[in-house]
């Protein structure tokens, strides 16, 4: 599964966009299309979308399992062991009868992700799930998302204003500002823009690559028919020349 990182400063429009995708807000103009459906027909595929928008909507005096079971009842799911399976996927299977009001913020976020997984969605929408977490909580949520993508054929749409953290997760990125999508780039393109590098100007990249390989260079990328970006041994410019 792919992880699409939605980047923008606070107030850029990330949450509003995600609320519209989740059916929690209506667009004032334009059109939303998902899974080949648009407009009023979106109701046919809303069940294929799981959302965690802003704070997790959990019952504080219930356990993690009870919260998942409540969501299951709303979805008409009565399969035995289903709630336990969800909790296992988000790393909360062994929290026992601990009330969610006593959970850490990271645990609450993972429970929120678990509740969004009820119904086995094809698209998981996560609105700044690492916002406000300590380093351990960030790592736990990141591991949960990565494990879900590795185990299931699921697309994750995740927003954040922390580019450094999203760079450890996402495979593709969209950059938004003032409600407008400015750019879409791949992870490789993002790393290229953010990394220190030396750009080589060559006549033929296909002839230059074997030379780089022979010299022991591994981290490089062909940009176009006349340029190669090199990301290692930057102080070794004499050898590159």
Locate the predicted segments by residue.
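Conserved ABC ATPase "signature" region
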Residues: 69, 73, 80-95
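Conserved ABC transporter NBD signature motif
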Residues: 30-40, 44-45
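Helix-to-loop junction immediately C-terminal to a conserved catalytic motif
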Residues: 22
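Catalytic Walker B motif of ABC-type/P-loop ATPase nucleotide-binding domains
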Residues: 124-128
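Conserved catalytic motifs of ABC-family nucleotide-binding domains
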Residues: 120
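ABC transporter nucleotide-binding domain
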Residues: 142-232
């Amino acid at each position: 599964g792919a992880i699409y990182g939605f980047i923008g400063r606070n107030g850029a429009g990330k949450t509003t966009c995600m609320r519209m995708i989740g059916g929690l807000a209506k667009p004032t103009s334009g059109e939303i299309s998902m899974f080949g459906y648009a407009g009023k027909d979106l109701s046919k595929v809303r069940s294929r979308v799981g959302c965690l928008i802003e704070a997790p909507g959990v019952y504080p005096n219930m356990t993690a399992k009870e919260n998942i079971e409540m969501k299951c009842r709303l979805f008409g799911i009565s399969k035995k062991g289903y709630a336990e399976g969800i909790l296992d996927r988000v790393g909360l299977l062994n929290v026992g009868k601990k009330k969610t009001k006593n959970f850490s913020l990271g645990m609450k976020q993972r429970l929120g992700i678990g509740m969004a997984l009820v119904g086995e969605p094809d698209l998981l929408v996560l609105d700044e799930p690492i916002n406000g977490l300590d380093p351990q909580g960030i790592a736990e949520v990141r591991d949960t998302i990565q494990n879900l993508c590795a185990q299931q054929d699921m697309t994750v749409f995740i927003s954040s204003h922390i580019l450094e953290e999203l760079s450890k997760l996402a495979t593709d990125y969209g950059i938004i500002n003032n409600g407008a999508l400015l750019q879409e780039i791949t992870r490789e393109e993002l790393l290229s823009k953010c990394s220190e590098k030396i750009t080589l100007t060559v006549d033929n990249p296909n002839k230059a690559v074997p030379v780089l390989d022979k010299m022991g260079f591994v981290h490089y990328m062909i940009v176009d028919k006349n340029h190669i970006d090199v990301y290692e041994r930057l102080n070794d410019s004499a050898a590159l020349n």
